[in-house]
Structures are given as C-alpha cells and as structure tokens.
Amino acid sequence: LSFAVRELGCIAGINITASHNPPEYNGYKVYWEDGAQFTPPHDKGVLEEVLAIEDLSTVKTTSEEEALRSGKFQVIGKEIDDKYIENVKAQVVNQDAIDRMQKDITIIYTPLHGTGNIPARRVMKELGFENVYVVPEQELPDGNFPTVSYPNPEAEEAFALGLKLAKEKNADLVLATDPDADRLGVYVKDAKTGEYHPLTGNMSGSLLCDYVLGQKQAKGLEKQAEAEEKAAETGAKETFVYAAVDPDRAYGFVAVAAG
C-alpha cells in the first residue's frame, strides 16, 4: 500500500486491518501521500472530519460505476505487485554475496496467517534463496489466527511453530511478519550452541544499518567528504563516521561516532 500510494500519486491510502492485534479487533490505518502512516497534523485533521459527521446520510457518496467512469476509482492489478517486487529487489546492496551463500542458508518463514506469504517468498525466491520453508500451519490467510493468540512477531509465542520447524530443518534464520506484513520478527541460530535467539527491532535496525553502510563503504559509494557535503546541503548538524569489521557479514558492528 505504501508503495502504491507513491507509485500512483495518491493523496492517501487506507488499510482496513487489526495488524498484529488479537482476532477480536479490527482497525483502520491511513497513509499520507508520502506512503508513511499519518502523523500530526494530518491525523488530527482526519479525526476532526470524522467527529463532525452527525448523520451518515449527509456524507457525499457516489456509485462504483460512476467512480470507475470518472477515473476516481481504480482496481490495481498484478502490474503494481510486479513493480513493488522489483523495487524491493533493487534495494539489494550485494547480490554477489547472496549468490555465494544462497545454497548454504536455510530460512524458515511464517506470515502468521496474514498477507506476507506471497510477496515475501517471491522476493526470496527471485533473489536466489533456495532453501526457504514456510510454516504450513500458518501459511494461508485466516483472520481467526488459530495457532496463536496474539499474531505479533515481537512475541515469543508467535515463533513457536517456526522455531519447531527451524530445529527440524537445521535452519539458520527464522523470519515472521505480522498479518498486514509491516512488522518483522527475527530469530538467528547460534552456530556454536545451535540455540535460536531473537533480535529486537533495535538490533535488526543496527545490523541493517551496519551492513548497508559497510557495503557502500567497501564499494566506495559514500566517501566521507561526500557524506559531509550531503549533510551540509540537507542542513544536518552531525556527521557520522562508520567502521566495519567485514563488509560481507551482516553483523560485527564496531562503532558509529558522531563528529
């Protein structure tokens, strides 16, 4: 949805979802024209408009036929999915590393009965990862979330079936997305003990930042002088200096110092 809003030049996007909440809940997520969820003052403005409605009969409506005819309503198809997948794949910073390791890494994935199954597995397949297994009990969409009480990939309970399958397959990585696929949980295997450990959001973010910056540094795409020039142009008050142990590793964070 975030991608489609920007790609199609929409002023907003709406997702009817309870996200990672229990099945008795429902919800309403609104995205602004930048593809991000509403923030002040837009959220307040929308709420004020809703509260101003005294009678639903006064709300202006139009028929689906008229909306289609006027171009205000469009049913998006596979072309948006394809563009989104290509955009995600374009974010890869080291395809060579993937090519070297894709046959040696085993990944367990669960969409937790939600919408992530097709796009997540498609991206991994098209990038070349061959050993990807989905948790069968949680593969298909089901708003009742029968295998978990709380489909939040931050909760240990949500990983129970994924970790069980990971041990059976001797997997290296366990991934879970929440039902509307905008939240990611990660477990990694300790190569020494064979135990699986969760990564917090802060850990995952730090590792991603470390890896992307390490790849850019290794390829000479971001010289310090260039970074300082960009910082000056954008009004940034701090410059960040990065040091990596091994640019081919997605871990090994050493230091990020403000200067």
Language-model segments: residues:
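Conserved phosphate-binding catalytic cores of ATP/NTP-utilizing and phosphoryl-transfer enzymes
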Residues: 1-11, 155-172
